[in-house]
Amino acid sequence: MIACYALGLSQAFLYVRGEMALAQERIALALDEAYEAGYIGKNILDTKFSVDVVMHWGAGAYIVGEETALIESLEGKRGMPRLKPPYFPAAIGLYGKPTIVNNVETLSNLPWILNNGASAYKKFGSESSPGTRMFAISGHVKRPGVYEVEHGVTTFRELFYDDNFCRGIRDDN
């Protein structure tokens, strides 16, 4: 909602990949609760700002991580990248209108940045790559999970073997 408010948008779409059934259930419940509490919908928190959120269940193709493929899927087409030019959905996006596409990782940074400031956020990471990055690691590691690390500071070796993260390969193989 922060991004919608900042940009003056009245409609947002949440695209959830088809194979993520549990995420779909949880997001649908969260949306219902947010509408009921007045955090989304008409006149949010008794203001003149209104935004509706549409959740779209995708077919489950990895390629829809590419922003124009995601837009194609939202439009009910096969989720394949669009021919370019135009290169950016900000020029011609969903239903031919200017469109902003952000992922969960990007949007999850907004509350922290708003509360603490962009200069404080830039203190994380390296000078050439400020900020943090989230890694979802599964498979044959001792502690699978989602880990937030600083750009340019944490190595993949640390991510996989450090006690603060994955703690190494399962069965030490």
Segments and roles (model prediction):
Residues 4, 160-161:
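Residue-level preference for well-ordered alpha-helical positions
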Residues 153-158:
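Short, structural beta-strand-to-alpha-helix junction motif
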Residues 24-151, 163-164, 169:
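Hydrophobic alpha-helical positions that pack around
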Residues 1-18, 170-172:
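Glycine-rich phosphate/pyrophosphate-binding loops
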